[in-house]
């Protein structure tokens, strides 16, 4: 079963019929929705917050930005599973990224976990978020970098911008990947498809979307039982113009988002961001070389192409 048929029973179909808070509860394992936030394992313990000036997004950041000293923040714009408006639905994963010195901006509001309001039960149409929310996140972050009085004034590196997302949110990331400010893309548990799905009315993400990629791309997929597996592997085969890596961990479509600190997939995402945005040698070593970290880890299957020879 690939994502084109599985969306009827997967998280994407939920987005068109229930509230963001109800969808978040459906997507998260029992107990996960009520678990406390985790600060991440990076050097900068992280937090999440809603900012009035950013009405359609939630910010994940180091709790003490000043502790970074002269080091600059990178920016990651994030699309949620189901294109939902619950920006806390993958909070452990996003807090982990933020703890490594990234300003992660997720579409939506806090609708699950700590800080969430009671579920309203309101039925919202699909999609609850749009690709433009990712662009708005990048716009806001880069504007804050130059705004006198902003807590982020001069603290963001505008060359360190990534876009990423889970499932339907990954499709949103693909749709905006042509933005020249974006330096890398992470596609998680997702892949493009031809046509239009009744469960995702109006969302068209054909294979031609892959031509928008102008930077290195990482796919993190849940193995053959992931409903996005077939579409993602088709994408990997078709991408011939930019470096692309395909990292498969056999955990299914739900990934490791709800494991402590986002689990194994979050660590791979951090290593990729550190390599692609900061030139980090340790991050590079997870992907490149005959004895690369993912190459020798029996839990992962790594494929890659179009990279310069090591």
Please report, for each region that a protein language model flagged, where it lies by residue.
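A fold-wide structural signal in alpha/beta-hydrolase
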Residues: 75, 101-108, 184, 245
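Alpha/beta-hydrolase-fold serine-hydrolase catalytic core, especially in secreted/extracellular enzymes
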Residues: 251-254, 259-310
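N-terminal cap/lid segment of alpha/beta-hydrolase-fold proteins
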Residues: 27-71
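Short beta-strand element of the alpha/beta-hydrolase
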Residues: 70-81
